[in-house]
Amino acid sequence: MQPTFTSIREARRWASLFLQQHQREPRVADLLLEHFLKWTPSQLLAFDDQRLPDEAEKDFAQAVRQHAETGIPVQHLTGVGHFYGREFQVNENVLIPRPETEELVLGVMDYVRDENLQTPRIIDLGTGSGVIAITLATELPGSEVSGVDLSEEALEIAEKNAAQHGADVRFYRGNFLESLLEEPFDIIVSNPPYIAFSEKDKMDDTVVDFDPALALFAEEEGLAAYKTILTQISHMKQKPKCIAFEIGHEQGRSVSTLIQEMLPECHTEIRPDINGKDRMVFAFVK
């Protein structure tokens, strides 16, 4: 049965309670209202005594039910994810952008500025929706940024996002660096699949049921993608100056050791995120 509401406030109250009853986050109600009304959070608070337009009411109630009953992410319902203050198109073919990845991007930008690199060549491996590559291209004028992904569907989204933000990024389809070993890059950045298949049963349904498995899981206890990338780097004619990986919070030592074994000329740093969990490994050519 389709609920009806006398005001936006009443719609928020109904949705929050419905979501709580299904063990979902009540704040999803506000995110969906902001999307369907095209309002800011402050507008939602200031005008919550107004009536919800009929079409928005129907779409809102349907989206709340879908999220509550299936776990489908809000970003898939709205088609939008946020990263570094920008909106990006997302769907079931790409990972939803996550705040921890912003810290990886900040680390790369700090390196470029600290080293005073005027025209750095950067490649993002496993680019997905393109948020890393597009953000770096936008925030680092003069940089030459590329993105690679194995998924054609993901690359379609990345291309749309680059066009939306006016970012000059070249996208390639491939298995990480496999077809680009002759190309020189100053920086290689990647948020590869790093979750072990053994962790699947412990994960939230909003992730495991809706994010693409290709972007989540890796063999060898989540380390297979790092090994592939590092093997490819070892075969490059010109090694990068900097390698930046996002990692699982318990993988810091394992990934750092892999780098030191496969690229002994590198110095590695395990870096925590804002919550104090190991989330990044940076490697620099000595």
Predicted regions mapped to residue ranges:
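Conserved SAM/SAH cofactor-binding pocket of Class I
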Residues: 100-202, 228
